[in-house]
Amino acid sequence: MLKLSFYRQKALEVLTPLYGEREAKSIRSLWFQERLGLSPVDCVLSENEYMGFDEFHNDLLALAKGKPIQLILGIAHFLGGNFFVDENTLVPRQETEELVLAILHKFKQKSLRVMDVGTGSG
C-alpha cells in the first residue's frame, strides 16, 4: 500500500510527456474514478491516505504504450451513457461527442434521422 499522492504523482510523471498536462490529468481522473471510486475532489482530500491499487502498475504500463484508458477500463462514457469497449470496438472520442452535441443543438427543432455507417461496433 502506498499513499494516494504517490499514485497521483507517478501517473502524471508518465502520462504528461505523452499526452500533455491537461489530457494526463483528465486520464488520471477517469482512471482513479473507475478503479478506486474516487472523484477528483476525493483524490485531493485523500491524498495522504494509504491505498491498495492492484491494477496501478499494469494499467500504467499499458497507458505508457499508448493504449487508450477506455480499453484498459473496458468502459467508455459517451453522451451520458456508459458503453462496454474492448479491442474489437472503436472507442468513442470526445470530438465525436462534441460534434453530435453541435448537430443536436443546430437542428433541435427538427426531427432527425441518422445512419451509422462504418463505425465498427455500431
What are these regions (language model features)?
Residues 1-73:
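N-terminal auxiliary segments of SAM/dcSAM-dependent transferases
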Residues 58-122:
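SAM-dependent Rossmann-like transferase core, predominantly class I methyltransferases
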